[in-house]
């Protein structure tokens, strides 16, 4: 007789991972959570809104995971997974409510799964949302031993008449960029071709550790700004860099004019460019040091930057909006 374990699925290791995961997930629970992990579904009670709209987003971490495999560091990519989802729904003014994750692997190692979910829980705490469920799939023969994939799904909420959709953006509005923590979770297929030795020294650390810096979560500072200012549009700078993402906030035909010298380019991007990538391709692939962009009235710009600094963020006036063709112009 052949057992499930002999086929490559270790149920006991699965039980162990669930127990380890529960202690991390419970730290994220907020008022709306109605049940513990282990049920068939997660339940969340909606807060009192006049005309609520649910806003959802899903994403993964991509080939940044390969850096984590090779560095044997597993507790940061969970933060990336949350960040990629909650920063997207934040662009429409939505407050994150809850999150679900999905982890797939060839051979389940409970301690590794627990480190992954520790990162997810950390990201949920940073974004003030609850981790209410997930799935860990052991798929022998499908993934190589030591490899895994992680993806997530976030749900947030906004008042219908407060949704940010770019419809109020005007000619002459300014663009404020909030600093990133590095490449975040995009461009890693290119990075892996450029950087072979992850243990090479870079700025006093191994370059592999620099490349694993988790994606910054912008929820707390941006939600505070939304309480004070008329923010007309927002963009999460992910795959495709400035060119792909900034125009996504425009409902009408505008062009974003970005001054490349308006903020300091982090050293990691200059290093990657020195390895043979053209500057224009850098801006079309990476966030280049700006992870989130706000479109606001010019009169509010100075105060917003001041508030960001007080909240521990770095904000810069990086450009302005003019009539155009849903494009980006770098100067």
From Swiss-Prot:
The keyword Cell division does not apply. Belongs to the AIR synthase family. Signal peptide: none annotated. GO terms for cellular component: cytosol. Its EC number is 6.3.3.1. The lineage of its organism: Bacteria, Bacillati, Bacillota, Clostridia, Eubacteriales. It is found in: Cytoplasm. The keyword RNA-binding does not apply. One of its GO terms (biological process) is adenine biosynthetic process. Keywords: ATP-binding, Cytoplasm, Ligase, Nucleotide-binding, Purine biosynthesis. GO terms for molecular function: ATP binding; phosphoribosylamine-glycine ligase activity; phosphoribosylformylglycinamidine cyclo-ligase activity. This is Phosphoribosylformylglycinamidine cyclo-ligase. Pathway: Purine metabolism; IMP biosynthesis via de novo pathway; 5-amino-1-(5-phospho-D-ribosyl)imidazole from N(2)-formyl-N(1)-(5-phospho-D-ribosyl)glycinamide: step 2/2.
């Amino acid at each position: 007789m052949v057992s499930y374990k002999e086929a490559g699925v270790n149920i006991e290791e699965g039980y162990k991972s669930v127990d380890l995961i529960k202690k991390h997930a419970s730290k994220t629970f907020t008022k709306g959570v109605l049940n513990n992990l282990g049920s068939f579904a997660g339940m969340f009670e909606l807060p009192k809104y006049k005309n609520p709209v649910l806003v959802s987003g899903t994403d993964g971490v991509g080939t940044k995971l390969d850096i984590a495999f090779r560095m044997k560091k597993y507790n940061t990519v969970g933060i990336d997974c949350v960040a990629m989802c909650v920063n997207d729904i934040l662009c429409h003014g939505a407050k994150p409510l809850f999150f679900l994750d999905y982890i797939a692997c060839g051979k389940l190692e409970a301690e590794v799964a627990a480190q992954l979910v520790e990162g997810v829980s950390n990201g949920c705490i940073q974004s003030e949302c609850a981790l209410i469920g997930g799935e860990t799939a052991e798929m022998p023969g499908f993934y190589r031993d030591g490899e895994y994939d992680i993806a997530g799904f976030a749900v947030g909420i906004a008042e219908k008449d407060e949704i940010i959709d770019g419809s109020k953006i005007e000619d002459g509005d300014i663009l404020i960029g909030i600093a990133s923590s590095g490449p975040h979770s995009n461009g890693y297929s290119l990075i892996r071709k450029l950087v072979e030795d992850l243990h090479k020294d870079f700025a006093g650390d191994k370059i592999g550790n620099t490349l694993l810096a988790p994606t910054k979560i912008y929820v707390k500072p941006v939600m505070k700004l939304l309480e004070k200012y008329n923010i007309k549009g927002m963009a999460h700078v992910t795959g495709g860099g400035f060119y792909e993402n900034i125009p996504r906030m425009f409902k009408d035909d505008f062009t974003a004019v970005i001054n490349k010298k308006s903020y300091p380019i982090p050293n990691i991007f200059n290093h990657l460019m020195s390895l043979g990538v053209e500057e224009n391709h850098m801006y079309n692939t990476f966030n280049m040091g700006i992870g989130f962009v706000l479109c606001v009235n010019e009169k509010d710009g100075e105060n917003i930057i001041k508030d960001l600094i007080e909240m521990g963020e770095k904000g810069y006036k990086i450009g302005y909006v003019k009539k155009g063709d849903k494009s980006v112009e770098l100067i």
